[in-house]
A protein has these predicted regions:
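Helix-loop-helix junctions within the multi-pass membrane cores of secondary transporters/permeases
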Residues: 239-321, 375, 379, 386
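Active-site-adjacent helical/loop segments in soluble small-molecule enzymes
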Residues: 37-49
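Signature of multi-pass transmembrane helix bundles
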Residues: 1-17, 29-35, 60-231
Length: 386
């Protein structure tokens, strides 16, 4: 963690002092690229290996973890709604050039349909395009099919899985250099001025996420484990949140989370599935972003949103957030769908997406950090509860 902080500080200083030295940003691009490149293989082989070695009748806690993921999404959306009622935000709409080529989903049905279509896509195509729902589906199919394979086949699969995990560890050891490149790129390209005009919106978004991280999640930990929640919460923040914050991709953080689960001594048969699944459907941060941006757009247009509509928004945000899987800025694409609940025209909703891109350097970083660190937290809760 000390090396990562050093990399962060050096990247910040270099971004302010020599912003033209663009070669430094290559370190960040390579780090994120390496994590994204290895993650699909890690998930595929780890899940296959875990399932083919699983004995009949062996228990996992996946059902409970999935329930935690969904509850986390719903509660986070509710926190965002309360925050927007206490601190209503008026948006300053700008040019949406960065969002003009985006086609947002037409509704929750399209989001869920896309999710189901991704489930059965070609397994090779899924690995190449980091389609984690598809990777999980085929890894489970092959893993179950290989349960009756001979010992040599199972050992070979386990060796490949171990080799992939070792490669991941080597990449993670380069995190200080990667984070230095990422923070340099952010500061040199975005600067700090672009963020100041949206200060209140950023505070509401980040504040809502902080409430979930420091209040809601510890309460959930305590309810199910009857232990002091903060050691586990802060371990997840230190080991998972920080790297997710800078990579801004739940998919890229999967190897980091796998390594943390191993360090915590969690059941590999469970976390090898729950972590990549969490990167797809555990989107508490996305639920907050969707809710806050939709309600802020409604407030800007003087549209009154009653309590019942707010509750419907919570459910809609929680469900649709599960479709914003593993993609930096993915939740922004779902803002127009949430805005349609209030009758906001699509062109205006797309302006809200444009605002999201401007503040994305903070919003998306915090959102991904919350999403990804919660994957480990909820998996650990299920393990400790047993």
């Amino acid at each position: 963690i000390k090396r990562i902080i050093c990399g962060l500080i050096i990247g910040l200083v270099l971004g302010l002092v020599v912003p033209q030295a663009s070669v430094i940003s290559i370190l960040g691009t390579m780090f994120v690229g390496a994590l994204k490149g290895i993650a699909p293989l890690l998930v595929f082989f780890l899940v296959m290996s875990a399932l083919c070695h699983m004995k009949s009748g062996q228990k996992t806690n996946l059902k409970f973890i999935i329930i935690l993921y969904m509850v986390g999404n719903l509660v986070s959306a509710f926190v965002a709604v309360i925050a927007c009622r206490l601190f209503p935000v008026t948006l300053t709409f700008t040019d949406t050039a960065s969002a003009t080529d985006i086609t947002p989903p037409s509704g929750i049905a399209e989001v869920l349909t896309n999710l189901l279509n991704n489930l059965v896509k070609n397994p090779v195509d899924s690995i190449v395009n980091a389609n984690y729902i598809g990777i999980l589906f085929w890894a489970v199919i092959f893993g179950i099919a290989l349960k009756h394979a001979n010992k040599g086949t199972k050992d070979a699969l386990e060796n490949i899985s171990d080799a992939t995990a070792t490669a991941v560890q080597w990449i993670i050891n380069c995190a200080p250099f990667g984070i230095m490149g990422l923070i340099f790129s952010t500061i040199s390209e975005q600067g700090l001025d672009a963020l100041l005009s949206y200060g209140k919106l950023i505070l509401v978004l980040v504040g809502s996420m902080a409430v979930v991280i420091f209040i809601i999640n510890p309460v959930i930990v305590f309810i199910f484990t009857k232990q002091n929640p903060f050691p586990l919460v802060f371990t997840c923040l230190k080991e998972s949140f920080i790297t997710a914050f800078f990579t801004r991709s739940s998919a890229a953080n999967i190897p980091v989370n796998m390594e943390l689960c191993k360090k915590l001594g969690l059941d590999e048969d469970t976390y090898s599935i729950s972590i990549p699944l969490g990167a797809t459907i555990n989107m508490a941060g996305a639920a907050i972003t969707i809710s806050v941006m939709a309600l802020s757009t409604a407030h800007t247009l003087d549209i009154h949103v009653d309590f019942l509509t707010s509750i419907i928004l919570c459910v809609l945000a929680a469900l649709s957030a599960a479709g914003a899987s593993g993609v930096a800025g993915g939740s922004l694409l779902l803002i127009p769908m949430a805005c349609s609940l209030f009758g906001v025209p699509n062109d205006v909703a797309m302006q809200a997406v444009g605002v999201g891109f401007i503040i994305g350097v903070i919003q998306d970083s915090c959102e991904t950090g919350l999403n990804s660190s919660s994957d480990v937290l909820y998996t650990a809760i299920a393990d400790i509860r047993e």
